UniProtKB/Swiss-Prot annotation:
MF GO annotations: ATP binding; metal ion binding; protein folding chaperone; protein-folding chaperone binding; unfolded protein binding
Primary location recorded for the protein, binned into one broad class: cytoplasm
Disordered: region residues: 1-20
Annotated HAMAP family: CH10
Domain of life where this protein originates: Bacteria
InterPro entries, alphabetized: Chaperonin_GroES, Chaperonin_GroES_sf, Chaprnonin_Cpn10_CS, GroES-like_sf
Identification of the protein by name: Co-chaperonin GroES 2
Organism: Rhodopirellula baltica (strain DSM 10527 / NCIMB 13988 / SH1)
Top-level taxonomy: Bacteria, Pseudomonadati, Planctomycetota, Planctomycetia, Pirellulales
Subunit structure: Heptamer of 7 subunits arranged in a ring. Interacts with the chaperonin GroEL.
PROSITE patterns per the UniProt record, alphabetical: CHAPERONINS_CPN10 (PS00681)
Family listed: Belongs to the GroES chaperonin family.
Keyword check for Cell membrane: no
Amino acid sequence: MQPLGERIVVQREESETTTAGGIVLPDSAKEKPARGTVVALGTGKLLDDGSRADFQLAAGDRVLFSSYAGETVEVDDTEYLLMREDDVLAVIE
Protein backbone atom coordinates (compact mmCIF):
# COMPACT_ATOMS: atom_id res chain seq x y z
CA MET A 1 0.00 0.00 0.00
CA GLN A 2 1.44 3.38 -1.01
CA PRO A 3 -0.07 6.39 0.80
CA LEU A 4 -0.45 9.74 -0.95
CA GLY A 5 0.64 13.23 0.11
CA GLU A 6 1.48 13.69 3.78
CA ARG A 7 -0.05 10.38 4.85
CA ILE A 8 1.78 7.44 6.39
CA VAL A 9 0.94 3.78 6.97
CA VAL A 10 1.49 2.42 10.49
CA GLN A 11 1.23 -1.17 11.67
CA ARG A 12 -0.17 -1.10 15.20
CA GLU A 13 1.66 -3.09 17.89
CA GLU A 14 -0.18 -6.10 19.29
CA SER A 15 -2.05 -5.53 22.54
CA GLU A 16 -1.39 -7.57 25.65
CA THR A 17 -3.49 -10.75 25.85
CA THR A 18 -3.10 -11.29 29.60
CA THR A 19 -2.97 -8.99 32.62
CA ALA A 20 -0.08 -8.82 35.08
CA GLY A 21 -2.15 -11.11 37.33
CA GLY A 22 -2.44 -13.76 34.60
CA ILE A 23 -6.04 -13.09 33.54
CA VAL A 24 -6.63 -13.72 29.83
CA LEU A 25 -8.41 -10.78 28.22
CA PRO A 26 -11.10 -11.28 25.57
CA ASP A 27 -10.79 -9.17 22.39
CA SER A 28 -13.65 -6.92 23.52
CA ALA A 29 -11.77 -5.93 26.70
CA LYS A 30 -8.42 -5.16 25.08
CA GLU A 31 -7.44 -1.57 24.47
CA LYS A 32 -5.77 -1.02 21.13
CA PRO A 33 -2.27 0.33 21.75
CA ALA A 34 -1.43 3.78 20.41
CA ARG A 35 2.00 2.58 19.30
CA GLY A 36 3.19 1.12 16.06
CA THR A 37 5.79 0.98 13.32
CA VAL A 38 5.83 3.17 10.22
CA VAL A 39 5.76 0.88 7.16
CA ALA A 40 5.26 3.39 4.31
CA LEU A 41 5.40 7.13 3.64
CA GLY A 42 3.56 9.23 1.08
CA THR A 43 5.16 11.77 -1.23
CA GLY A 44 5.20 14.58 1.36
CA LYS A 45 3.08 17.64 2.04
CA LEU A 46 2.65 19.90 -0.98
CA LEU A 47 4.05 23.36 -0.19
CA ASP A 48 2.87 26.69 -1.62
CA ASP A 49 5.83 26.84 -4.04
CA GLY A 50 4.90 23.44 -5.50
CA SER A 51 7.69 21.49 -3.82
CA ARG A 52 7.19 18.69 -1.31
CA ALA A 53 8.17 18.85 2.38
CA ASP A 54 10.43 16.11 3.71
CA PHE A 55 9.00 13.74 6.30
CA GLN A 56 10.31 13.87 9.87
CA LEU A 57 9.69 10.12 10.05
CA ALA A 58 11.21 7.16 8.23
CA ALA A 59 9.98 3.66 7.49
CA GLY A 60 10.79 1.45 10.46
CA ASP A 61 10.36 4.18 13.11
CA ARG A 62 8.39 3.13 16.20
CA VAL A 63 5.86 5.86 16.93
CA LEU A 64 3.32 6.96 19.52
CA PHE A 65 0.08 8.41 18.14
CA SER A 66 -3.32 9.62 19.29
CA SER A 67 -5.67 6.72 20.04
CA TYR A 68 -8.22 8.22 17.61
CA ALA A 69 -5.70 8.82 14.81
CA GLY A 70 -6.08 7.42 11.33
CA GLU A 71 -8.33 5.09 9.44
CA THR A 72 -8.07 1.33 9.92
CA VAL A 73 -7.35 -0.55 6.69
CA GLU A 74 -6.94 -4.32 6.28
CA VAL A 75 -4.61 -5.64 3.57
CA ASP A 76 -3.83 -9.36 3.21
CA ASP A 77 -5.28 -10.11 6.68
CA THR A 78 -3.00 -7.50 8.30
CA GLU A 79 -4.45 -4.39 9.95
CA TYR A 80 -2.82 -1.02 9.24
CA LEU A 81 -3.59 2.58 10.13
CA LEU A 82 -3.55 5.23 7.42
CA MET A 83 -2.89 8.60 9.09
CA ARG A 84 -1.33 12.01 8.61
CA GLU A 85 2.20 12.61 9.83
CA ASP A 86 0.76 15.28 12.17
CA ASP A 87 -1.16 12.54 14.04
CA VAL A 88 2.15 11.14 15.33
CA LEU A 89 2.99 12.48 18.78
CA ALA A 90 6.51 11.07 19.23
CA VAL A 91 9.13 8.67 17.92
CA ILE A 92 9.99 5.90 20.40
CA GLU A 93 13.73 5.29 20.57
